[in-house]
Amino acid sequence: KLEYRGYDSAGIAVYDGNKIQMQKAMGRLKVLEEMTQNGATLPGTVGIGHTRWATHGAPSDLNAHPHFNKDHSIVVVHNGIIENYLKLKKKLMSKGYEFLSETDTEVIAHMLDYYYNGDPLATITKVMHRMEGSYALGILFRDHPDEVYAVRKDSPLIVGTSKSGNLIASDVPAVLKYTRDVYFLENEEIVKLTRDGLHFYNIDEEELQKEPTHIEWDMNAAEKGGYEHFMLKEMHEQPKAVKDTLTPRIKNGDVGIEELGMTDEEIRAISKIFIVACGSAYHTGVTAKYIFEKLARIPVEVDLASEFRYRDPILPENTLVVIVSQSGETADTLAALRLAKEKGVRTLGIVNVVGSSIAREADNVMYTWAGPEIAVATTKAYSTQLI
């Protein structure tokens, strides 16, 4: 029921009474269903699953969730972005940990392993204190076979409860088939799900009392988060998308743009900027032209990619060509990028899809963290591109 959000891979981990079994695959959910015979090859009553929209690491089987520690005794799924994951990863590697994927999520699994003392709750809070960013986590510990732990910080997470079982999800539609009674986790809250009940805690490991909310939505409305249309929903998601795009780039009040991959001297040497895009992304460029020329006093030319690629543009030395695309796969825009690279000028991609062609081929890339956009008319993708 969360497929409408868009995803590039999926995976599942199930405890079968002896060990945690796992299967994951790139592509549509149907691929995973076929691999597991619609779940028949992964028997069990305790498990976690995930559909992934790539943020760290391109879509692949290895980068798909769940992720695990070295002996598969701790398994994690994760929505969100761990901003300091590279720092944490370096520390873990210095301790002898090896990584199979490019994701920030695998760092979480190894962090849990590093601090694990037999007490899941204490270990989780210790790791929470060391992670920066947004996350919703689902966690299995092999030595606590009848428990699932879930954690929320700046990323949605709900808990559904019924006589037949308890569930976690990032959005209400996923649980409505089983229950309409849900708990909404607040920031830095943890929940332990067991066969018999739910236990809620704060980051100080103090147990909390929470009341469920009864959901009145029908399934169709729920998939749109209570909005009549996806576009309306995405309009209201713009503040979060803008925040998610800005936050990782602001440190102690300063804007960090290390993603440009340029020194201060190289930035000052830029003599002209071309912004190349199609559709709504082109209009982002038109707006950006006014801002760049007013604040940076650098001449900016905005081109439709379909025109740029065919008109043999004059690209002086010290030109920066900025390529803007939500998908990172727009054919004319990709061709324009390749033309700019052939002419030997520096290129910067601004895209929303990690691992896309433009992201791979541009000299440097800046990601917009808008998440998948379902409506045809753009809203949050435009806003984050402009930011």
Where are these regions (language model features)?
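Predominantly extracellular/luminal regions of secreted and cell-surface proteins
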Residues: 232, 236-237
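Acidic-histidine catalytic/liganding microenvironments
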Residues: 238-239, 295
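Glycine-rich phosphate-binding loops that contact phosphosugars or nucleotide phosphates
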Residues: 268-387
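Functionally constrained cores in energy, signaling, and assembly domains
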Residues: 39, 61, 67, 83, ...
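Conserved short alpha-helical segments that host acidic/polar catalytic motifs at enzyme active sites
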Residues: 1-224, 228, 240-271
